[in-house]
UniProtKB/Swiss-Prot annotation:
It comes from Staphylococcus saprophyticus subsp. saprophyticus (strain ATCC 15305 / DSM 20229 / NCIMB 8711 / NCTC 7292 / S-41). GO terms for biological process: negative regulation of DNA-templated transcription initiation. This is Transcriptional regulator MraZ. Belongs to the MraZ family. PROSITE patterns: SPOVT_ABRB (PS51740). InterPro entries: MraZ, MraZ_C, MraZ_dom, MraZ_N, MraZ_sf, SpoVT-AbrB_dom, SpoVT-AbrB_sf.
Length: 143
């Protein structure tokens, strides 16, 4: 399980150090792709297979299902950790997520998310204000 928030930097070649707490669970190779809210999602190879199977059940007769699958899968790339614990984030994904030098990497249960630090900060500030209301509306269990 992935959890926590970590600040890292992109170098001039588009490489970013993956938080050491995430490296063991991600293994040497994992998948990154376009996520929601202008961030990147990162999945283990095993979790990616689960998601792929779920996506296969989407009705191809629905235009939105086709659009979503195209965006999600066309942005997907397998990355590999180098000896320094870095991954190379392709230019198209850096552009999609508006990644600048300063990044925030967060753990969200079964995935990691890679955010531009400023975008994450804005999203967090906006979401923090309504956190309790969201919990009340969406979550149907006690902690």
């Amino acid at each position: 399980m992935f959890m926590g928030e970590y600040e890292h930097q992109l170098d001039t070649k588009g490489r970013m150090i993956v938080p050491s707490k995430f490296r063991y669970d991600l293994n040497e190779r994992f998948i990154i792709t376009r996520g929601l809210d202008k961030c990147l999602f990162g999945y283990t190879l095993e979790e990616w297979q689960v998601i792929e199977e779920k996506m296969k059940t989407l009705p191809m007769t629905k235009k939105d299902a086709r659009k979503f699958m195209r965006m999600f899968f066309s942005g997907a790339v397998e990355v590999e950790l180098d000896k320094q614990g870095r991954i190379n984030i392709p230019q198209n994904l850096r552009q999609y997520a508006n990644l600048s030098k300063e990044c925030t990497v967060i753990g969200v249960s079964n995935r990691i998310e890679i955010w531009d630090r400023e975008t994450w900060s804005s999203f967090y500030d906006e979401s923090e204000e309504s956190f309790e209301d969201i919990a009340e509306d969406l979550i149907d269990f006690d902690f």
